[in-house]
UniProtKB/Swiss-Prot annotation:
Belongs to the PriB family. HAMAP family: PriB. Homodimer. Interacts with PriA and DnaT. Component of the replication restart primosome. Primosome assembly occurs via a 'hand-off' mechanism. PriA binds to replication forks, subsequently PriB then DnaT bind; DnaT then displaces ssDNA to generate the helicase loading substrate. GO terms for cellular component: primosome complex. One of its GO terms (molecular function) is single-stranded DNA binding. Keywords: DNA replication, DNA-binding, Primosome. Disulfide bonds: none annotated. Pfam families: SSB_1. It comes from the Bacteria. Residues 8-108 form the SSB domain. PROSITE patterns: SSB (PS50935). GO terms for biological process: DNA replication, synthesis of primer. This is Replication restart protein PriB.
């Protein structure tokens, strides 16, 4: 626990553009899921030099609270996504980092 009493053991936030069409499905237990990729680009200072930062990360949204927000997500739209990260092993055996969204904010 930090001095500010915040629990941030696995907290991740990223601003980026939606890179592909969201894929929606429902689990056998009836939970709605939405998956899409978010692409981030920025310039950051590191050791006195400017470097380009770029990443493309899978965003997983689950449950009724946020699923309604996903209905208006379109390719190219800029979003702030806050949540926690997990690793998922794909069918080809590669590990992929996934950001599980707990908060989504549309940026105009």
């Amino acid at each position: 626990m930090l001095k500010s009493n915040l629990e941030v053991d696995n907290r991740f936030s990223l601003i980026g553009k939606v890179a592909d069409f969201p894929k929606r499905n429902k689990s056998p237990s009836g939970i709605d899921h939405c998956l899409f990729y978010l692409e981030h680009r920025s310039n950051k200072k590191e050791a006195g030099f400017t470097r380009q930062a770029w990443c493309k990360i899978a965003i997983q949204i689950s449950g009724n609270q946020l699923i309604e927000k996903t209905q208006s997500i379109t390719v190219g739209q800029q979003l702030l996504v806050v949540g926690f990260v997990t690793s998922h092993r794909s069918s080809n055996g590669l590990n992929q980092l996934i950001l599980h969204a707990e908060q989504i904010e549309f940026i105009e």
